[in-house]
Amino acid sequence: MLKGIRQSDKELLPVINDYGCLFLCFAQASPLIFEGKEGRQALNKIWSEATKKGYISGDINHDGDYDDDGEAEIKNHNALANEFFALDVRYDGTHHKADEKIPSKVKVVFGKYVWKGGHFVVLNKSKAVTFDSFGKSNTVQNGKLESMRWYYANS
């Protein structure tokens, strides 16, 4: 769970500031507590370690940014969730449509809102936003839910 941490916090890695919304959704859904300076440092370390392990893609073409296709993307949802965020879940690998009914066995739901770009948030089973890494982002305020990612409990 994030306490007092926003995606725009300057102590976070710039790549998290720009592309870390889904990553921060994992942190919010986690039973671990990320708070203050220590929490931001822990998140930066997790991002770096997960990138080294290939769970998150890095600067693929080595041009010094993460704005190219396939960069700063979570590639192994299950490993990231379980190894770094203590979430005992399994991603089904599907981008579910916004109008699909969420099964009762789903433990965690992340939604992708779209308006001038995409932004991930944590949803409850009624599809209401329970966490937005920017607080009240323009994408959520002005956009619409395009798809969902479902994570099932492992046990």
Predicted regions and their residues:
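Active-site-adjacent structural segments surrounding the nucleophilic cysteine of cysteine proteases
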Residues: 1-68
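Intrinsic-disorder/low-complexity loop/linker signature
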Residues: 10, 64, 70, 93-94, ...
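Short glycine-aromatic motifs
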Residues: 10, 55, 85-87, 96, ...
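Stable alpha-helical elements in mature extracytoplasmic
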Residues: 22-25, 42, 73-77, 98
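Short, well-ordered strand-loop elements centered on a beta-strand within folded domains, enriched
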Residues: 41, 69-73, 127-134
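Helix-adjacent hinge/juxtasegments
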Residues: 50-92
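Active-site-adjacent substructure of cysteine-protease-like catalytic cores
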Residues: 89-127
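Noncatalytic regulatory segments and standalone regulatory/sensor domains
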Residues: 102-104, 124-155
